[in-house]
A protein has these predicted regions:
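Short, strongly hydrophobic alpha-helical membrane anchors
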Residues: 1-9
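Nucleotide and nucleotide-moiety/phosphate-recognizing core
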Residues: 10, 14-15, 60-63, 71-110
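Short conserved micro-motifs on helix faces and helix-strand junctions that flank
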Residues: 19-20, 65, 112
């Protein structure tokens, strides 16, 4: 693969992987798996850490927070290193993958684009 194809592949992979990873909502998943309820129908209706902690409490809420942070941090770290290696643009890789992680968090494809 030539250098230009590698760069384009890396850009597409960063966008898709960051978006899809950040679109996973652990509060929704954990509320359904562990409590057999949908957090979006309880409390404030917000499917996030604060509502999860308010409704269910416990240590599991802190796991939700940790996974919420990691779902964006891991792709940003991985792709910033890959961008550094292939294009010498570490900061661009972090910002680029971070942007798509924000989009995935706010408009997740897994939940009909409702974050």
């Amino acid at each position: 693969m030539d250098e230009q194809a590698i760069k384009i592949t890396l850009l597409l992979a960063a966008a898709v992987c960051s978006y899809l990873a950040a679109g996973v909502n652990y509060a929704v998943i954990f509320s359904k798996v562990f409590y057999h309820q949908d957090i979006r129908t309880l409390g404030s209706g917000n499917p996030g850490f604060t509502n999860f902690k308010r409704v269910f409490g416990g240590k599991l809420a802190w796991v939700v927070l940790l996974l919420d942070l990691l779902k964006a941090a891991i792709p940003v770290i991985i792709f910033s290193m890959l961008f550094e290696h292939f294009m010498l643009l570490r900061q661009f890789g972090a910002v680029y993958s971070g942007f798509f992680a924000m989009l995935g968090h706010a408009y997740p494809i897994w939940y009909d684009f409702k974050g």
